[in-house]
């Protein structure tokens, strides 16, 4: 590279050839504004730090609870992006825990190096590896267009009357939940297809038909986040916490057997609620079937990359479903092998550069720090202390497993109203709830109860802000928040009642309660 720092002044350049510095100057700097939520988060941090140290709580534990309070306020208020909050949490853990005495020997401090290692420990968790692989496979689906083909084939097979369109929308979300391990990616795939169908029908964007279709996309996506383990990041985070904190994990098939029946029942409930509360202006939509066939014909025959991706996806489903039955390969390992095949020269479907451009790396950062936060809460005894505090002052110990589940799941559903990310909610609260379960006496199945509480984390049905897929659908301007809540409130109430019914019967028969 030529060094120009000591060059003599040159003649003025022509106006048609502006200098690199001038070209750079025209790029406006990003405008950063302070959000009130950041001040509230810092205040929460300082308040918890200033409280006299409670009996039984370590110094490091109190500081971790202060960091947890900071994280919850930042995530609820969305004062900064989730990625920025993850870096903030990492720095706070390194600084505050680094100068705290260790749990085992209070005369020795953790040191910033060890504390930073605690803050980054989540990045070595197998759950993070699985999320990364899942995001890469989602990118492959988008690159090849296989997700779009699956959606159109499903709609074509079911039909395009208003009644069948709703059934088809739910069927599409179920099919994609099996092969696209990202709720946001699934909704982003289905939304343009359904908007094309709505446009082909010639119905108004503000009609009940359009609103019903788009709300169904969002709500069915959340419902099937419960049914399939690999359908959402928060599920994988839940499994990661099980493995790290309880020493056990739920297989893909075990999750499916437990969650899919509830999701099927709620899909039926959703269908009838949309039909009842957003009645379609007409039952017959001329040109609907032709519109779907036209879209499908435009895709042409199935391409070679689509066939290879379909084969790998089916292979992954087979291996996920037979883990512990026919083989001992865990879900993350199998998924990574599938990913290697998809990136192999000649037989793969995408290269690293393409995958890099289409992967939401911020999700992985938040996920890794979330696991670190939960693990550090327990390694500093903060989680155990808080769990004991909750059990002692709430009277949970006097109740049976069903009532404990009813109380804790209701708490998660209500607190979710303040969170825009189920992953953030899981990272903040699930380790504490696991600590509560560990503190409870009796023979409660703590792994099973953790899975069931993980189900309720996906209850983002009431407000559009409660889940990214809701916001994707809201962006179509086919419905407003009031219409969304009109469907979402009864879905939440019935879904919670169904959770309790399943906990008292089916899940108890399976041994999870």
From Swiss-Prot:
It comes from the Bacteria. One of its GO terms (molecular function) is organic anion transmembrane transporter activity. It is found in: Cell membrane. Residues 9-20 are annotated as: 4 X 3 AA tandem repeats of P-S-A. Its main location: membrane. GO terms for biological process: carboxylic acid transmembrane transport. One of its GO terms (cellular component) is plasma membrane. Belongs to the SLC13A/DASS transporter (TC 2.A.47) family. DIT1 subfamily. NCBIfam families: dass. This is Membrane protein. It comes from Cupriavidus necator (strain ATCC 17699 / DSM 428 / KCTC 22496 / NCIMB 10442 / H16 / Stanier 337).
